[in-house]
Amino acid sequence: MENKKKMIFNVLFLFLVFVATLYGVFHGEDLSEIAEILKTVNLYWLFPGVVCVIIFIWGESIIIFYMMHTLGIHLKKWKCFLFSSVGFFFSCITPSATGGQPAQIYYMKKEKIPIPVSTLVLMIVTITYKMVLVVIGLGLMIFGRGFIRTHMYDIRHIFYLGTGLNVFCVASMLLLVFHPVLARSILVKGMELLEKMHLMRHKSTRIEKLNASMDQYHTTAVYLKDHMMVLVNVFAITLFQRFALFTATWFVYKAFGLSGTNAFVIILLQSVISVSVDMLPLPGGMGISEKLFSMIFEPVFGSTLLIPGMILSRGLGYYTELLISAIFTIVANFTIGRNLRKKA
């Protein structure tokens, strides 16, 4: 019952944010003019953009397949693609993408994959996923100051905030993995402080859950110490995966027949948006992503093509991802665990 209420809340929240985003983007705009501009788009340039989205989803499935193999669990690649699709679908519709991994663990459990194993794999996926954003963010802050001044000066503060939040997130996860005793001490003291301030009720079961979590982090630490090259390989795949999705915006740029801005700048600007919004509590960064796009891509697309460009870029980067992952999540519902049920 509680899960149903949570799902209803997430769907309603997604709908409200979507409506607010539509209003914010199109209020005061000439919709007929935008529609006419969209009709002039070269569709052949959009097909590679869709391929970029598929590569993005496929990339995580390769990571899951690869890591499961190192743990002695042999899965078919198409099942890993379904696990990946489930994760992206629920991440797209929940605030801060919180619903993705619990859903993946649920579907993996249906395939008789032990929860500690699926938790380990998905934790490493999360760490490397965030690490790519940290590398982009810190790389620009240290080596790309000229780029920041030239292309994204007006949004630099939210970019710094997004980078800082991602650094904090990755640092926290690495602390939990490699220093679980210290992390446990910090968390216990933090909970005691919140209880004293009456911001949290005392629950004895909370410590038990914390201890169980620490065991999982310890397992991850042991695995990483013995498989450092696996982490390096996963990071490389994740880097390729993320930049494949960022590249979709360049194909949108070419679909309008534009030239003058090189692919590197467009792809990097799209990555800046991802770094900035990734940790914000909005499904798919909806609303704020559109705002940032309009601020940093106007010199690239021009004022006339800015909103049509935004529609296609977000259409590929978020809504196409949502649609594709939704379709394969439905497939997962009918196929994951099916053979096991037949044998039973």
Regions found by a protein language model. Give the residues of each.
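Hydrophobic/aromatic residues in alpha-helical transmembrane segments
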Residues: 21, 59-67, 104, 245-252, ...
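Membrane-interface helix starts
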Residues: 7-8, 40-49, 222-236
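Alpha-helical transmembrane segments of multi-pass membrane proteins
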Residues: 79-87, 264-275, 304-315
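A short amphipathic helical element positioned immediately N-terminal to and/or at the very start
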Residues: 32-40, 108, 213-225
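Short, membrane-interfacial amphipathic segments enriched in basic
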Residues: 196-217
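Membrane-embedded helical hairpins/re-entrant loop segments and their flanking transmembrane helices
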Residues: 61-85, 252-269
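Transmembrane helix-loop-helix hairpins in multi-pass inner-membrane proteins
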Residues: 1-32, 36, 90-200, 282, ...
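Transmembrane helical segments that form the transport core of multi-pass membrane transport proteins
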Residues: 223-273
